[in-house]
From Swiss-Prot:
PROSITE patterns for the chain: SM
Keywords recorded for this protein, A-Z: RNA-binding, Stress response
Protein name: RNA-binding protein Hfq
Molecular function (Gene Ontology), one example: RNA binding
Species whose genome carries this gene: Shewanella piezotolerans (strain WP3 / JCM 13877)
Family matches, as NCBIfam families: Hfq (TIGR02383), PRK00395.1 (NF001602)
InterPro entries in UniProt: Hfq (IPR005001), LSM_dom_sf (IPR010920), Sm (IPR047575)
Keyword Cell division: no
One BP term from GO: regulation of RNA stability
Top-level taxon: Bacteria
Family: Belongs to the Hfq family.
Residue ranges constituting the Sm domain according to the UniProt record: 9-68
Subunit structure: Homohexamer.
Function: RNA chaperone that binds small regulatory RNA (sRNAs) and mRNAs to facilitate mRNA translational regulation in response to envelope stress, environmental stress and changes in metabolite concentrations. Also binds with high specificity to tRNAs.
Amino acid sequence: MAKGQSLQDPFLNALRRERVPVSIYLVNGIKLQGQVESFDQFVILLKNTVSQMVYKHAISTVVPSRPFNVSNHQATNAQAGYNAQHDETDEK
């Protein structure tokens, strides 16, 4: 497994498993919303009213709508950072 995917795969899998609604921002600024239905090395299948295949190279940011559990230790640390960031935002 490539080093870059050691965080990506558990993160996306937890989003899929827990059916967490996400906002996906593309590099061109477009915002897509839905749930991660499936993913592989190159694409994410995003389901809303329709299913869309989104190429990962076109994605800038994936933003979960709520906290969720990630089983991978590295991913858990990233989730803690996500929670801390949103706690700061909520206080403003």
